[in-house]
Amino acid sequence: MEIVRAATMRDYQECLRLFLQAHNENDQFSLAPDKLHWMLTRFLNPDAIPEDDPGLRGIIGVIGREGGLEAICGLCISDLWYTYDKHLTDFLVFVDPEYRTTGHAKTLTGWMKTQADIIGMPLMSAVVTNHRTEAKCRLFRRTFPKVGELFLYYPGSLTAGSSLSRTAH
């Protein structure tokens, strides 16, 4: 069975590689490299976050050795607009294409549930992709109770990866 471990700063380049691969495969919006760097640095080195910093907290779980990651999952603590109740939400579950037949995705979703159990927070997860969507949804339906669906509309001629996120401030 694969072992999911918490990524560290030593995994930065490999995490970045997998995040960029995931964006290339699943992008719905343009990439903001500075935001990605900020988040990776923050999640890979949580001890550097000041205690009074109210910003985003999370963890990145990985499968594979240092310098050769095979799969990655990102979780962060969040809340919904109508409550202060916290929950975990995933922002990435991705398996390198070379390792897609290994069961890593199932291992990562199990790890996500374990993290929710450890900290005692509900876990909210979504599949946001146009690539192999149905297969991913089947895995998530087998793993998590369904509580809704997610839809995305691009007005007019705007399409996924458009400049929408750069122009709507």
Annotate the PLM regions.
Residues 1-17:
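A short beta-loop-alpha structural element at the N-terminal edge
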Residues 20-45:
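Conserved GNAT-fold acetyl-CoA-binding loop/helix
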Residues 41-61:
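A short helix-loop-beta-strand connector motif used in the catalytic cores of GNAT acetyltransferases and
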Residues 62, 68-77:
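Conserved beta-strand in the GNAT
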Residues 79-90:
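A conserved beta-turn-beta hairpin within the catalytic core of GNAT-like acetyltransferases
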Residues 91-102:
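A short, internal acetyl-CoA/4′-phosphopantetheine-binding micro-motif in the GNAT/acyltransferase core
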Residues 107-123:
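Conserved acyl-CoA
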Residues 112, 124-136:
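Conserved beta-strand-loop-alpha-helix junction that forms the acyl-donor binding cleft
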